[in-house]
Amino acid sequence: MDDADALQLCLERDRLLSDPEFARSPIMCKLLRFLVDYKLSGNSVPLKSYIIATDALGRNANFDPKTDSYPRVQMVRLRRMLDNFYLRNGGENRLVIAPNQYAIALEPNRP
């Protein structure tokens, strides 16, 4: 990721975080920040439910992704919030998280 892409990613994250819907949800803000920071770090390890739970959502090291769906539920919630934000606000770019994935991406916004 070059500097211009990183800047656009940060600007879009900040735009989302300043939205009242996101501001009312500290968990979604924390998760969004984590996903963007992870992308910016260039970490090549694919995100998994365990990493999301322990590093982003505060679960302890004993977290078992086979029995606890909390990170998956929060990711679905975040995807929904992203979709709603872009329906309301539009914009040139948008942050997306593909279904069944945890990695965030910046893409051109399609009407």
Indicate residue ranges for each PLM-predicted region:
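An N-terminal, helix-rich hydrophobic module
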Residues: 1-110
